[in-house]
């Protein structure tokens, strides 16, 4: 596959790590040559503070919260460092074409306008070899802070809103997107509030009984 860096198998799932510079080429190959005709979701993850890099002022606290101490945040050991700060995960489906039912035959019975047929004894059950089922794969790219990624809207139009969400919440820019604007927050909102370095402030509220 074009741009393939690594193939990972875990928990029955396949992840294809791809060179960001060849993302569109890889996605086009998966659509045209491997049958992955539907993009279900794009999930962006911020790994700031993951591994052995200290983060000062993590999520806006005064002194910062060190995620690198063993046992912190429920971690029994230090996690392995990630290749870059952000991961973009593209969840793809290969949905087989729907086949038209065969015409009624002499052995079929009709109930309330519906044709009912007995399943042939040699028909393979759903989910077994011999019967085409939906396949899944995850395409993953790693990005540094501020590093853009090419839009895959020309490959799968469903990427439109997903890429806008990644921009709105994480600040990941999809170059070539037809309308890369905020999708959840106001247009004049400052920053991208699902980033781990986004300052979470607050105003004291006085309650009276």
Specify the residue positions occupied by each region the protein language model found.
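Terminal low-complexity/charged segments
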Residues: 1-209
């Amino acid at each position: 596959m074009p741009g393939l860096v690594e193939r990972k198998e875990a928990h029955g799932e396949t992840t294809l790590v791809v060179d960001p510079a060849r993302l569109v080429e890889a996605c086009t190959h998966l659509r045209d040559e491997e049958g992955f005709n539907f993009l279900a979701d794009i999930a962006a993850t911020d790994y700031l503070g993951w591994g052995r890099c200290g983060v000062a002022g993590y999520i806006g606290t005064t002194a910062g919260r060190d995620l690198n101490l063993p046992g912190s945040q429920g971690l029994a050991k230090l996690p392995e460092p990630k290749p870059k700060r952000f991961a973009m995960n593209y969840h793809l489906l290969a949905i087989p074409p729907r086949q038209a039912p065969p015409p009624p035959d002499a052995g079929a019975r009709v109930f309330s306008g519906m044709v009912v047929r007995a399943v042939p004894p040699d028909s393979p059950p759903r989910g077994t070899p011999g019967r085409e089922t939906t396949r899944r794969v995850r395409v993953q790219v790693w990005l540094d802070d501020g590093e853009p990624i090419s839009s895959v809207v020309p490959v799968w139009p469903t990427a439109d809103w997903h890429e806008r969400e990644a921009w709105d919440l994480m600040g990941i820019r999809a170059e070539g997107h037809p309308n890369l604007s905020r999708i959840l927050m106001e247009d004049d909102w400052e920053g991208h509030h699902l980033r781990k370095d986004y300052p979470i402030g607050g105003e004291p509220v006085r309650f009276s009984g």
